[in-house]
Curated annotation (Swiss-Prot):
It comes from Methylorubrum populi (strain ATCC BAA-705 / NCIMB 13946 / BJ001) (Methylobacterium populi). Belongs to the ClpX chaperone family. HslU subfamily. This is ATP-dependent protease ATPase subunit HslU. It is found in: Cytoplasm. GO terms for cellular component: HslUV protease complex.
Length: 437
């Protein structure tokens, strides 16, 4: 779990996301509160519940990007899901409890990586011994083994092929077996693929011919897993999920009930009702054991173009007490997105063209023109926020990108005139573009 202060979390998010100070502060405080709760002792620690967040803002303003960056910062089990992927319990499709099951798998993956790091030195030594056995045989003299060990460590044998037996990475018995409408064939606490794989002896490895260089990584992973206690790992992962798990629930506005709609709302209000106990705190059965959701942090987000936050069930609104409104992006914000962030669109475009030997030189007025065209098009057609910049920028560099292979060594200046010339038809035909698929 991260030990960053709220100020450090915000400044880390600032490297990649422009504006939206309120949203950054809210998620930073929520993330820090996870650490603060861990410092409490006794029964009070169990009483402190996470303050779930509802982020409201137009499309393309940074909601999903905040989630992506937060996942890397969290250092805890983190899962991003779309609310539209779930259906009400009892109907064909994924029910919301699958969120917790998926989060547990993420937690086990994170914990396994930590455990593997702890035993890496022993695993590397064991992997080296197995490769030596494959090269010279287990009965070779110590002198021969040492000679080959030296060559192995000097990378002299990397291209040599050896035959080794690797355990399969997943169940081999029935790899394609799924229940219709239920990806992963996961029913409550039982995973059918795992069950059938074990019953049919799916854990037995087959000999494979592979180069020495390619053999190292799977062998180290396999030897690490032998040194790790799976039961203890699972218990630790579940504890980590229960105490520090974070779920980012995107597109929550798409499950608001539509007015005037009759009949069963399998993917809308029913899903909201199913989310209530999950967010409030319940126990979900998984194949690894029961998981309590009382202290899992839920961050929901939506554009709310058609619906309003008040269209959500009142009980669900009450379970998302912290509301943050993200602001629409301005011309200045667009200019910052193009140039100021760590992996800005201009930096990406310049780097891509440099691979062909073409140097792009964007002037200040070109950046300004790109930002203004994006705002104009957003205003006249559908406002898709920062995503519009990609459309405009691709149109501007389309010709250069197509002919880059033949222009190696050239420097191409891009100014406001060049931008306007390339996007003239885009800006002129915006009123027609809404009718084009």
């Amino acid at each position: 779990m991260t030990t960053f202060s709220p100020r450090e979390i915000v400044s880390e998010l600032d490297r990649f996301i422009v504006g939206q100070k309120d949203a950054k502060r809210a998620v930073a405080i929520a993330l820090r509160n996870r650490w603060r709760r861990q410092q409490l002792k006794g029964p009070l620690r169990d009483e402190v519940a996470p303050k779930n967040i509802l982020m409201i803002g137009p499309t393309g303003c940074g909601k999903t990007e905040i989630a992506r960056r937060l996942a890397r910062l969290a250092g805890a089990p983190f899962l991003k899901v779309e609310a539209t992927k779930f259906t009400e319990v009892g109907y064909v499709g994924r029910d919301v409890e699958q969120i917790v099951r998926d989060l547990v798998e993420v937690g086990i993956g994170l914990t396994r990586e930590e455990k593997r790091k702890a035993v890496k030195a022993k695993a590397e030594a064991a992997a080296e011994s197995r490769i030596l056995d494959a090269l010279v045989g287990p009965t070779a003299s110590q002198a021969t083994r040492e000679s080959f060990r030296k060559k192995l460590r000097n990378s002299e044998l990397d291209d040599k092929e050896v035959e080794i037996e690797l355990a399969p990475s997943g169940p081999q018995g029935m790899p394609m077996f799924e229940i219709p409408g239920m990806p992963g064939a996961s029913m409550g606490a039982i995973n059918i693929s795992d069950m059938l794989g074990k019953a049919l002896g799916g854990q037995r490895g087959k000999p494979r011919r592979i180069t020495v260089a390619d053999a190292y990584a799977p062998l180290i992973a396999e030897e690490s897993d032998k040194l790790v206690d799976d039961d203890a790992l699972t218990r630790e992962a579940i504890r980590e999920v229960e105490d520090n798990g974070i779920v980012f629930l995107d597109e929550i506005d798409k499950i608001c009930a539509r007015e005037g709609r009759s009949g069963a709302d399998v993917s809308r209000e029913g899903v909201q009702r199913d989310l209530l106990p999950l967010i409030e705190g319940t126990t979900v059965a998984t194949k690894h054991g029961p998981v309590k959701t009382d202290h899992i942090l839920f961050i929901a987000s939506g554009a709310f173009h058609v619906s309003k936050p008040s269209d959500l069930l009142p009980e669900l609104q009450g379970r998302l007490p912290i509301r943050v409104e993200l602001q629409p992006l301005t011309v200045e914000d667009f200019k910052q997105i193009l140039t100021a962030t760590e992996a800005s669109l201009i930096k990406q475009t310049v780097a891509l063209m440099e691979t062909e030997g073409v140097t792009l030189d964007f002037t200040e007025d070109a950046i300004d023109a790109l930002a203004r065209v994006a705002v104009e098009v957003n205003g006249s057609v559908e406002n898709i926020g920062a995503r519009r910049l990609q459309t405009v920028l691709e149109r501007v560099i389309d010709e250069i990108s197509f002919t880059a292979t033949d222009r190696s060594g050239e420097t191409v200046p891009i100014d406001a005139g060049y931008v306007r010339e390339r996007v003239a038809d885009l800006a002129a035909n915006t009123d027609l573009s809404r009718f084009i698929l």
